[in-house]
């Protein structure tokens, strides 16, 4: 389209980054396969010290695809993947794509009720998870359409030396799966490829075909499945590399952001594998392990949420570390405070890195990032400039009327990474995706921001009531619904409390049902109930009992008042 139709003040400030690209129109697997044919001997990823070449990876993906065909997975079928960043997750993700299926990506630490919801909402016919999560899946399986449950183990992907150590430590803690359990163990599953008699197990898919389902709160804060296409992911890969002209084939990305997150899957995994990079897979994040891998592998690119960078600053093991290999350090998932950016930029300088942290912004409705601070031009507090072929408007909230430069409004996004739809939800799809007179389909983000005269974007806040804890989106309404369902609870309200490490932590206020005592025992009953029904990252750190909830004039719970009261408590405690 002509840039004259949409205001693009950023076009003169892109530096080496082009305004437009030609996009690959095949499947995600085909994008990776092209690279594998070009650089078969290059390392695709390294997992706990064991490296896999592109040639080996493609062979494993094709074997996995044949096994999927053997168990009956067909074009358009959904397969749920609930895995950490490990080789089997990568093989399964691309194998599902290869047979024409749709990968339904979920958090392996999800609570039982959430797993049941994800399996049913997607109508998944198969699911793959780790042995340590087997029990949660087995408890809900009979209430879903899942025919085949595939169980992998981290130990199967380890080198013999590392495996021995793993089995003496972490491996000992995992409960043994019964021999007669109705599951297929990973090794047995892969052997099923020998029984695949389909000549055409590879299904040709187009760029516009649905390929992945990721989950987010949508515009109302209730969980929505976001349907993303092959082109969404392939375009993102090309955009990310275009926005980083310093990238070279073989460059290493530390992949600690999880696979069920657009940032982790889209940037840390698919961008690297579709453009010739190398992923250093981190299955379970700790700041200590993250820091160790950066130094050990001389990583070129790292990505994380602000809490990660806050943690790295405090690590004694980083003293004297040489980070001169770094070409790009990206922050997303939450606002990066000016103070933290300054601290981490100094940290990078002190550790011989000649770069700064570059902040980005995006939504799951656009896979992940759609704008990024350019490497040649930093503006304090800005989240950067749009990627090639991505357009950003700032409008009066919920309208198509653009506001002047420098004025706050709702952030709208358009471009090749815009989702296909919300799964089975045409009403919210229509509310979020709207076509304007310029012919573009725009995502109404519900986020507030400002654009300056040079096209730099400044994030101002989330219009929706959402808590961000360690980069994860936590929707208060979901936790309130769970709490309110307990017989002890009459009413609840959940808020985010500022936390120096997590940015925000979750706190619940509860008005108890008549006759229920406000005791420590009652609190522990409710905390145990939450642990069973709420994902680990969304778990309230505290429950406070209230005789009554503050209300607004229209009778709604005044959650902002509770937030203000909590902030006042924190301030008073700090002044003591």
Features from the language model and the residues they span:
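Gly/Ser/Thr-rich phosphate-binding loop
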Residues: 299-304, 313-380, 391
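AMP-binding/adenylate-forming catalytic domain of the ANL superfamily
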Residues: 3, 152, 532-557, 575
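AMP-binding/adenylate-forming catalytic core of the ANL superfamily
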Residues: 110, 127, 302, 415, ...
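Conserved AMP-binding/adenylate-forming core of the ANL superfamily
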Residues: 41-86, 90-94, 111-116
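Conserved ATP/PPi-binding loop(s) of AMP-dependent carboxylate-activating enzymes
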Residues: 385-389, 401-433, 474
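Conserved AMP-binding/adenylation subdomain of ANL enzymes
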Residues: 234-252, 260-303, 315
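Conserved pre-ATP/AMP-binding loop-to-beta segment of ANL
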Residues: 176-215, 222, 246-252
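Conserved AMP-binding A3 loop
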Residues: 53-55, 202, 211-235
């Amino acid at each position: 389209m002509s840039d004259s139709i949409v205001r693009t003040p950023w076009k003169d400030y892109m530096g080496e980054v082009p305004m437009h690209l030609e996009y690959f129109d095949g499947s995600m697997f085909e994008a990776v396969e092209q690279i594998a044919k070009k650089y078969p001997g290059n390392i695709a990823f390294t997992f706990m010290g064991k490296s896999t070449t592109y040639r080996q990876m493609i062979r494993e993906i094709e074997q996995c695809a044949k096994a999927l065909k053997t168990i009956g997975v067909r074009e358009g079928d959904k397969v749920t993947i609930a895995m950490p960043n490990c080789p089997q997750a990568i093989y399964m993700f691309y194998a599902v794509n290869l047979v024409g299926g749709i990968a339904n990506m979920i958090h392996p630490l999800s609570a039982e009720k959430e797993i049941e919801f994800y399996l049913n909402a997607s109508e998944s016919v198969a699911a793959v998870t780790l042995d340590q999560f087997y029990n949660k899946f087995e408890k809900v399986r009979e209430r879903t359409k899942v025919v085949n449950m595939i169980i992998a183990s981290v130990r199967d992907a380890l080198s013999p030396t590392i495996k021995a150590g793993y089995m003496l430590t972490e491996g000992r803690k995992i409960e043994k799966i019964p021999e007669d359990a109705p599951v297929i163990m990973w090794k047995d599953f892969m052997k099923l490829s020998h029984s695949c008699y389909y000549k055409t197990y590879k299904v040709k898919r187009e760029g516009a075909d649905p390929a992945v389902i990721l989950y987010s709160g949508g515009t109302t804060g209730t969980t929505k499945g976001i349907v993303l296409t092959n082109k969404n992911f392939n375009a993102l890969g090309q955009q990310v590399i275009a926005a980083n002209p310093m990238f070279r084939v073989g460059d290493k990305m530390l992949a600690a952001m999880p696979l069920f997150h657009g940032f982790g899957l889209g940037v840390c995994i698919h961008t690297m594998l579709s453009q010739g990079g190398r992923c250093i897979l981190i299955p379970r994040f700790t700041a200590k392990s993250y820091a160790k891998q950066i130094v050990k592998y001389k990583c070129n690119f790292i990505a994380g949420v602000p809490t990660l960078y806050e943690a790295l600053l405090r690590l004694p093991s980083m003293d004297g570390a040489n980070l001169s290999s770094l070409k790009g350090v990206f922050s997303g998932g939450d606002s990066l405070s000016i103070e933290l950016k300054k601290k981490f930029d100094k940290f990078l300088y002190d550790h011989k890195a000649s770069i700064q942290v570059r902040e980005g912004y995006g939504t799951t409705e656009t896979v992940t990032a759609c704008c990024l601070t350019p490497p040649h031009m930093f503006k304090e507090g800005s989240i950067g400039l749009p990627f090639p072929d991505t357009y950003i408007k700032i409008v009066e909230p919920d309208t198509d009327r653009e506001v002047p430069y420098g004025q706050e409004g709702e952030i709208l996004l358009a471009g090749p990474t815009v989702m296909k739809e919300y799964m089975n939800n045409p009403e919210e799809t229509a509310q979020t995706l709207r076509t304007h007179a310029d012919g573009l389909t725009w995502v109404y983000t519900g986020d507030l921001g400002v654009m300056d005269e040079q096209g730099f974007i400044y994030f101002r806040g989330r219009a929706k009531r959402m808590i961000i804890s360690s980069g994860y989106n936590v929707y208060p309404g979901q936790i309130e619904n769970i709490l309110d369902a307990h017989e002890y609870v009459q009413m609840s309200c959940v808020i985010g409390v500022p936390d120096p490490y997590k940015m925000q932590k979750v706190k619940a206020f509860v008005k108890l049902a008549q006759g229920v005592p406000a005791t420590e025992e009652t609190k522990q009953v409710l905390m145990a109930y939450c642990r069973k029904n709420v994902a680990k990252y969304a778990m309230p750190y505290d429950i406070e009992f209230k005789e009554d909830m503050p209300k607004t004039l229209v009778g709604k719970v005044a959650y902002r008042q509770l937030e203000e009261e909590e902030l006042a408590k924190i301030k008073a405690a700090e002044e003591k």
